[in-house]
Amino acid sequence: MEESGFREPVLDAKSEVTGQLIDFQWKLGMAVSSDSCRSLKYPYVAVMLKVADHSGQVSSKSIEMTIPQFQNFYKQFKEIAAVIETV
């Protein structure tokens, strides 16, 4: 049998999952100062995550995104949700 080079990704939950989401918070903010001072007064979305690793150790992660970055992030999550609904 000849392999075409295309493979659908397969996720083995036990070996691939690196953490479990414990908490998810977000806020909309407005940048009023910047080290580079190139673009002030722009809106951004801040996302704060609490994640537990395989041993139960909880760590916090935060991400700041511009509005276009957040819109792309949101679009990708909608695509994930659509795929999940077909399973």
From Swiss-Prot:
Task: Assign the protein's first listed, main location to one coarse class.
Answer: nucleus
Keyword flag Transmembrane: no
Gene Ontology molecular functions: NF-kappaB binding
Query: Which sequence positions carry the modification called N-acetylmethionine?
Result: 1
Alphabetized Pfam families for the sequence: COMM_domain
Report the source organism. Answer: Mus musculus (Mouse)
Name this protein carries in UniProt: COMM domain-containing protein 6
Enumerate the spans annotated as COMM domain: 20-87
Described purpose of this protein according to its UniProt entry: Scaffold protein in the commander complex that is essential for endosomal recycling of transmembrane cargos; the commander complex is composed of the CCC subcomplex and the retriever subcomplex. May modulate activity of cullin-RING E3 ubiquitin ligase (CRL) complexes. Down-regulates activation of NF-kappa-B. Inhibits TNF-induced NFKB1 activation.
Q: Which GO terms describe its cellular component?
A: cytoplasm; nucleus
Note the subunit structure.
Component of the commander complex consisting of the CCC subcomplex and the retriever subcomplex. Component of the CCC (COMMD/CCDC22/CCDC93) subcomplex consisting of COMMD1, COMMD2, COMMD3, COMMD4, COMMD5, COMMD6, COMMD7, COMMD8, COMMD9, COMMD10, CCDC22 and CCDC93; within the complex forms a heterodimer with COMMD1. May form a homodimer with isoform 1. Interacts with RELA, RELB, NFKB1/p105. Does not interact with NFKBIB. Interacts with CCDC22, CCDC93, SCNN1B, CUL4A.
Query: Where is the protein found, in the record's own terms?
Result: Nucleus; Cytoplasm
**Its family?**
Belongs to the COMM domain-containing protein 6 family.
| This protein's UniProt keywords | Acetylation, Cytoplasm, Nucleus, Transcription, Transcription regulation, Ubl conjugation pathway
